[in-house]
Structures are given as C-alpha cells and as structure tokens.
C-alpha cells in the first residue's frame, strides 16, 4: 500500500492519496481545489487516480473532488447518507457513485469501507482502509472531520454556518453515538484526520499528523467516560466563531463545486489605488503588522501573510465586491500562489495588486500615512474607565472563559463585521487579543471603517497578566450601547479624512476628551 498525505498549512487541512502498488490504482480522499498537486504526485508515484471521494460536504474550502475526478478520468464517489435537505444535491450526485453505510471501494488490493458517522454533518462518512495483501482488518481510518487528534468535529456548523436552525443539539447527540460505535474498534487502528491545529472545524485540535484509536481513548476528551448530556454540554462549550465564508463554501460544495479560476496578478499603480480608496473598495495590506502599524494607506485592511491569512481573509473580506491587495511580494509566481490560496476559499474577485512601493508614492501625493497607535498595559491601566474608554476583546470564547480584562466587551474577530455596530465610536476604543496579532487586524478593520480613535494593546492579554493587573473570570459585557452606532463607511456619503475615508469624528460624532493612547485632546 502506498500512502501519501497532503497538508495545506494555510487551511490546516489534510487530504490523502492511497494506492495499490500491484495494480497502480489510487484513490484520493478530501481533495481541495489545488488538483494539480494530486496529479503530480500520481505521476511521480506512477499510479493512476482511479477513484475520488470525500468524507463530507466541506465548509472551510472549495472541494476539488469534481475537478480532480474530471481531470484524472476517475470515478467520483459521494455520500448518500443524511437525507436530502442538507446532503449533496442531485446536480452534485449526477454521474457519481452514491455511498451508503457499508459501501466498499476496491482500489486494486486496497479496500475502502464507508461507515456513516453523523454528528459534524448529517452525511459524514469515515473510511476504513484495509490492505488485502495483509488481511481483512482495517489498518486505519480516514476520519475527516469526525475524529481529530485530541478533539472531534464540531456539531454546530450546520446551524451556525449553513442556517439549519435547531440542528445543533441533535447533531451533538448523533456525534456522541457515532463516537460510541467507533470506540469499539481495535486500539491499534490508525486515525488519519482531515484537519490539524489551527482549523476552526474544532476547538482543540492537536498538531500531530495522525494518531491511533487507543491513544485517543487515553488523551482525547471526547472518549472520556461521560453521559450523553455531559458530552453535549462539553462539545458545544466555547466553540470558535466560524468565519463568514463557511456559509458560502457549504453552499458551493453541496451543489458540486467546480474548480475556481485563479486570476492572473494585475499590477496597478497610484492612480488605481486612489480610485480604490475613494470608492471605499476593500484593499488588503498583507505586510507584517508592525510595518502596517508604522504607516499605511488610510482605509486599508491589514491581514498579514501567514498561516492565518486565509482564515481571516474569509472572515473579514466580503465575498462579492472586487477587492485589491498590497504586497511586498515582487514576483508574478509568488503572487500567483497567494491568489491561488485565496481561490481555495472562494475569494477570486481580485481586481488588482499593488506593490508596497506605492506607499511612498501615496505619502508624496497626500502628505501622510495613517498609523496604528500602540498602547502598553501600564498606560491602559492608568486610563481605564476614563471618558467611556472601551476595551474590546477579540479572542475566542474558549480564551475568554479563562479570564478577561475588567469591563471588556467580547467580540471575537470573526464576528467583527457583523457586530461592529455594538462599538460606541463616540468614545475611544482599545482592542486586544492574547498577544497582539488578531487585535492588530481588528484595529485596522475599525480604522478602515472610519473609526478614528482606536488603539491596539501591545502584547495583548499576556502582557496585561505579566504586569500582574486584575483579571476577571465572569463573562464580559457583550456591548456598551446595545444598539448600532457605526455603519460601514463603504457606500455612504460623508466627509472624508485626509486618507479618503470617513472618520468617526467627521461623521458628526462627539470628539472624545481622552484618546485611547492616553493623551488629552484639545
């Protein structure tokens, strides 16, 4: 048996190719839209991709199953379990082999048996893999989003991302029963999961690439002895906020996703940047946070390149309007890779790209670059509570449950686009996360939407704790006002700041007496 693992660090997503070394046939499970990586690997291993399948309808990336099966001339297999309401559509299943609980796919002398393991999604399948040259017993299981290293797939996504109202608790109960059945398999069974650490498809995924059922029984909380009621409460507790793009991915993949078209980089200059900013288009500055903080074009959104780039792009960038990118990347090939990554989550409407040199040109023409004020913990301690200063905690619910700054408002970063109206911009705002990275993104998001008096807490919650300052354990306030006080700067007529964006003050809001940086304003 030939076994290949493909891991996409930007998605924290794993797909697999398993082949029979005698017949040179292969099956690919859970491919993403970068189908070329699988065909290249098959060519290198001198095998033919004969079968393509996936464990479930994915919510976090564009499926490559249809595109790969077409490119390789392979048989496509999809789950027929879970009912029609939230399963694959008839269009997606057209021409595909429908899998049921107990269905088998023989790949030469490799046998893949499907087992229905609902909970994360209604149609979810786990694939037990046997090497018939050695015996009938499975060597391992491709568990998709059912069982991870140290965690299990969250059962709330169908409701929170796809809109299936009232499905969360019943899904959690199905997940419990699926785990009970799975737990009777032998301890030596290898577990090959669909995601690793950093994926929002669970809350505490481990970073090990694989595990065994016996190991998970010892160290995975979900296999601990507990009642169904206890499990339901625990699995639903402190789940991370799903990014906004999950809903669109669920819809696209349920219909049968085609391979997205990756746009060629179109390099633009200062006139186009002026136009983009003037029209309130989304412009993503992908430079590191410290460079963005030191000087950026007003109205731009900072999402630094790195492992979390796709996650936060999917959470903060609108799906339909065209958007732009500012990058330090110089070559076409490197930029194509970035655009290819964005296409994996359906963000293909890139209207143009600006090299970071354009910032110097902007400063020459407009005379100023905007900065992100950095506030240290000592200063925040001194000014806390003055003139209605708001502290906004953008960490996950799980992090916040372990303690938070006194009086902090909790708005997870992924929810900021939908909850920006809960922030009263007539008063200064300080944002923080654990170490300062996510709050830097959040600060830029508020600035790009016309909020002027906003600062980032340098070092975040960790720095606050390191200074020995007070931490509360009760749940933080949800908002200060409970009403919408901010509307997106995009598409509204108002006075603009020097950078071409409307500021909170220009919109007629009261100018605060004390700024978020602690300086008294005139």
Residue ranges and their predicted role:
Residues 193-198, 203-204, 248-250, 286-288, ...:
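Short, well-ordered beta-to-alpha junction loops that form the rim of enzyme active sites
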Residues 52-62, 116-124, 191-199, 431-435:
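Histidine-centered catalytic micro-motifs
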Residues 31-33, 57, 81-82, 120-121, ...:
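Active-site metal-binding loops of divalent metal-dependent hydrolases
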Residues 27, 51-53, 140-142, 148, ...:
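Residue-level marker for buried hydrophobic side chains located in beta-strands
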Residues 24, 111, 121-241:
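Metallo-beta-lactamase
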Residues 88-92, 154-156, 168, 215-251, ...:
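Rhodanese-like catalytic fold shared by cysteine-dependent sulfurtransferases
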Residues 261-273:
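A contiguous, basic/glycine-rich beta-loop/short-helix subdomain that forms a polymer-engagement track
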Residues 12, 23-26, 33-116, 130-132, ...:
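Active-site HxH/HxHxD metal-binding segment of metal-dependent hydrolases
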